[in-house]
A protein has these predicted regions:
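Beta-strand-rich N-terminal accessory domains
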Residues: 18, 22-26, 34, 46, ...
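Aromatic-lined, polymer-binding surfaces characteristic
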Residues: 115-332, 336-342, 347
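Residues that flank catalytic or metal-binding motifs in active/ligand-binding sites
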Residues: 141, 252, 334, 428-430, ...
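CBM-like, beta-strand-rich accessory domains located in the C-terminal region of large
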Residues: 191, 354-355, 361-367, 371, ...
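Extended, charge-enriched "interface" segments that sit outside catalytic cores
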Residues: 33-128, 133-140
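Carbohydrate-active enzyme catalytic cores, enriched for enzymes
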Residues: 293, 297-479, 531-535
Length: 669
């Protein structure tokens, strides 16, 4: 969600709060920059209204080659996906849709609404009833499927894949003239298209591709180069520019740099490379903590941002001028965090927002888990045996990115026998891994969240999930983060999935820990503090608290401690509320959709396949077990964007005095 999209979903009153939260994050330099940005955007709008002719491309200039020339042996699902596309079948999020070949690029697959060809930058998409969810249209227009067609051609040499790629490009240029229509409304979307176009350009042979043979081919090349120039200049004119910017800025900078490295045919390409390099070197350190946690506190966007950094980094290596050591070190730290929170079954908690975004078509052609793919790629890039151990094997995408020869070193890394979870504490990001037998068949893994709400003043993609946690046993999820649900669907679902009650934490007075101002806005945040951390052979424990409820009567503070008995595969969770007055509290426990939860005389029995847990809840209080409930909204999990599946939520309600301990015990049996 970009800045403009966030504003579109607010009332006029909450817009005041939004602007205030934005302004709190701005430095003097940011104010000056935004003033200059406003002027440059005004100039860009004037260019859009009367577009300048594209400078003549210097065809004798050769861009950086940053992908291997030889196709790998692993085909993944490339041919299957390529044939689907040629038959008019497109996978948009969880849906397989018959959109035709080529599709109507301005028709939103969600609702089949044909959007007008007006000035893209002035289009608004807040009326989902009229326009559908714009994310579906944007997924289609990222051109990841074009990459799959290029891969299929390189693997087989079959003309139909090359012809299909040509037809998709020609139809897009005809239907989406610069700067008209929804596909010219977002600098981030233009950047993702450029990254995929750069990949396709190399897979099909670059300037000498058979795609460009004959008069028709030369015309296609001219149209493509013209659109590339427009894309890069569009990003340069409309990219995010203030200190509160999040992952869209990283994507925009990555697309700009990749374009400048791949297509140096114009003088402006040097400006694209310079702006991209300087911005990315800054953002990799600003947006990701030194311990590797991306500051949006959203696992899905951690994956997306890492790929932006990766593709720009590979393109920079191709130019012979790589990014700094600090850039690559921060990327390695990001993967060590992913390795830390991934359980023995390969599951990663769904903290914060996720829209299932993938940067590259190489990912959909490979199939499999994008996190595993990144771990394999990182193991080879950094020579990191722990990442290799966690990844387990080289996936097809890594072979396409790094080449078969480079991937041959993977087994050497595995043979070093490194631990698969090199770090368990990520204090700057507020994430801690507790447990026993990590990465073994008997693993008991807890991922505790004592981190901040999110990035910047609005924390657009953070959830109010302070002191929540996940639990997996033997590689099977038990207590989970239910995910995201939807961005633009029914408002009650959006607010529920980002609210505190949809997380494994304690809720006071039925209120969220932070005060929401809209779908992508938190008006009042909380602060978390880690009070104690202990690791020994017998015990793994953490104590933390947050102040999000101090706005309520009695100024309550919630404190939680986790203590894992490493010998008994059990955990005790203790909750306390420190307040001047008694408080009504609710504890929420969200179980995986694969869990069977039953009540017993002593509490609860939870089974996930052959693995069973016993759960003892605090004494007293009222207990309810909800499954797919809409009133209240509980008992749901969202594994994919706009996808809901019933699960089980256990709710405990009661009243507590100042400092009274609520004790919950989970034990493997």
């Amino acid at each position: 969600m970009n800045e403009r999209g966030a504003i579109n979903h607010m009332s006029s009153l909450t817009q005041v709060g939004w602007y205030w939260n934005r302004l709190r994050d701005l430095s003097v330099a940011d104010f000056v920059g935004r003033t200059g940005s406003s002027a440059s955007r005004a100039a860009a709008r004037r260019r859009l209204e009367a577009p300048l002719p594209v400078p003549v491309a210097r065809l004798d200039r050769v861009g950086a080659a940053w992908l291997p020339k030889a196709a790998p042996a692993q085909r993944g699902v490339v041919l299957q996906r390529a044939d689907e596309v040629l038959s008019g079948q497109w996978r948009i999020f969880s849906r397989l849709l018959g959109l035709g070949f080529p599709p109507e690029w301005n028709r939103n697959p969600d609702g089949e609404v044909l959007l007008p060809i007006t000035d893209g930058r002035r289009m608004a998409f807040r009326d989902t009833a009229a326009h559908g969810d714009v994310k579906y249209l944007r997924e289609l227009n990222r051109h990841r499927e074009l990459v799959v067609l290029a891969q299929a051609w390189q693997l087989t040499g079959r003309q139909r894949y090359l012809d299909g790629a040509a037809l998709l490009l020609e139809s897009w240029f005809a239907q989406c003239p610069h700067p008209r229509g929804a596909n010219w409304s977002s600098a981030l979307e233009a950047a993702i298209r450029l990254i995929n176009w750069a990949t396709v350009w190399q897979l099909l042979g670059g300037m000498q591709s058979p795609l460009f043979e004959g008069p028709v081919g030369k015309l296609l090349r001219t149209d493509w180069l013209n659109s590339i120039w427009h894309h890069a200049e569009f990003i340069r004119g409309f990219r995010s520019r203030d200190a509160a910017a999040s992952h869209p800025l990283v994507g925009e900078l990555a697309g700009l740099f990749v374009a400048g490295a791949t297509w140096p045919q114009w003088p402006e390409a040097q400006l694209w490379r310079r702006a991209g390099r300087e911005g990315l070197e800054c953002e990799v350190l600003r947006q990701s903590a030194a311990d590797g946690v991306h500051r949006e506190q959203a696992t899905g966007y951690q994956q997306l941002v890492w790929d932006f950094f990766l593709f720009a980094g590979l393109a920079a290596r191709g130019t012979g001028k790589p990014f700094s050591a600090a850039y690559w070190q921060r990327m390695e730290a990001m993967l060590e965090y992913v390795a830390g929170i991934m359980d023995a079954g390969g599951h990663v908690p769904l903290f914060g927002d996720s829209d299932e975004s993938l940067v590259s078509g190489l990912s959909i052609g490979a199939g499999g888990c994008p996190f595993h793919s990144q771990l394999a790629t990182g193991a080879l890039l950094f020579g990191n045996p722990s990442l290799a151990r966690k990844a387990g094997m080289v996936d097809p995408r890594t072979e396409w990115l790094l080449g078969v020869d480079a991937c041959g070193r993977f087994d050497e890394l595995l043979l070093q026998g490194a631990v698969a979870t090199p770090r368990t504490d990520f204090p700057e990001g507020g994430m801690f891994v507790l447990g026993s037998g990590l990465d073994s068949p008997d693993e008991f893994r807890v991922v505790a969240n004592a981190g901040p709400l999110g990035l910047g003043g609005v924390a657009a993609h953070g959830h109010a999930d302070a002191l929540s946690f996940t639990l997996s046993v033997a590689g099977r999820p038990f207590l989970i983060d239910p995910g995201t649900g939807t961005y633009h669907g029914p408002e009650k679902w959006r607010h529920a999935f980002r609210g505190s009650a949809m997380h494994n934490t304690l809720v006071l007075a039925g209120e969220d820990q932070a005060v929401s101002g809209g779908r992508f806005l938190w008006l009042r945040r909380y602060r978390t503090s880690v009070l104690a951390r202990e690791r020994s052979q017998a015990v793994d424990s953490l104590v933390a608290e947050h102040d999000g409820y101090r706005r309520l009567p009695g100024k309550p503070v919630h404190r939680r401690s986790w203590q894992v008995d490493r010998c008994a595969a059990s955990m005790t969770v203790q909750d306390q509320v420190f307040a001047a007055t008694p408080q009504g509290v609710t504890l929420y426990w969200h179980f995986s959709e694969d869990c069977n939860v039953t009540c017993t005389p002593d509490g609860l029995s939870i089974a996930n396949g052959p693995i069973c847990l016993e759960m003892a809840l605090p004494e007293g209080g009222d207990v309810s077990v909800l499954h797919g409930s809409e009133s209240p909204l509980a008992g749901w999990v969202s594994r994919g964007y706009d996808v809901l599946e019933p699960s089980t939520t256990v709710v405990w309600r009661g009243r507590v005095e100042d400092g009274e301990i609520l004790r919950t015990v989970l034990r493997r049996v």
